[in-house]
């Protein structure tokens, strides 16, 4: 079996491969977006359930397409979760040591950078996460977030400017 979904060939083996390949990455992404690791794990499970049900309609031909497709499902589910009345993102943060995106022995600089990224407004935090933690391109991010590529470039530039200013105030990275 290859690295991409085969339309019309949905199987448990395919689902297992996707979970093994993308599970940790999606959990890290959802954890950053939601600030709650347990809720993120629930969202990732729902992501794979939805992906499994929709495998026959997936038209990706490249492994990157599969990653972007799964990420789009997960990000949309996170957005839905944040829209719920009871969920207040600003009250939820997660320590860097719990992130799967970071090495277990994260350096002090990595911890400071993560903490600073967490202070960004959600729309900038999303693009930073997808670009630098998931290594997605601006066009892939645009597809995931259903926004124009130019908008993504603008948000990335603005987010980097904000990070630079905030890190300079902390005397970091100088």
Residue ranges with predicted function:
Residues 57, 72-92, 106:
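Arg/Lys-rich amphipathic alpha helix in sigma70-family domain 2
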Residues 88-115, 137:
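Internal acidic/polar
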Residues 23, 27, 48, 121, ...:
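C-terminal flanking helix
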Residues 48-52, 63-83:
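Σ70-family region 2.3-2.4 aromatic/basic alpha-helix that recognizes the −10 promoter
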Residues 19, 27, 37-54:
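Conserved RNAP core-binding helix
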């Amino acid at each position: 079996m290859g690295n991409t979904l085969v339309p019309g060939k949905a199987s448990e083996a395919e689902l297992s491969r996707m979970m093994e390949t993308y599970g940790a990455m999606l959990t890290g992404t959802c954890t950053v977006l939601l600030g709650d690791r347990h809720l993120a794990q629930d969202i990732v499970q729902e992501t794979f359930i939805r992906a499994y049900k929709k495998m026959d309609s997936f038209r990706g031909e490249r492994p990157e397409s599969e990653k972007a497709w799964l990420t789009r499902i997960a990000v949309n589910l996170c957005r839905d979760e944040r829209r719920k009345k009871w969920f207040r993102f600003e009250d939820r943060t997660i320590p860097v040591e719990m992130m799967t995106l970071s090495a277990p022995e994260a350096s002090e600089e990595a911890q400071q950078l993560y903490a600073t990224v967490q202070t960004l407004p959600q729309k900038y935090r999303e693009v930073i996460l997808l670009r630098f933690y998931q290594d997605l391109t601006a066009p892939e991010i645009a597809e995931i977030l259903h926004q124009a590529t130019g908008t993504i470039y603008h948000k990335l530039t603005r987010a980097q400017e904000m990070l630079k200013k905030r890190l300079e105030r902390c005397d970091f990275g100088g």
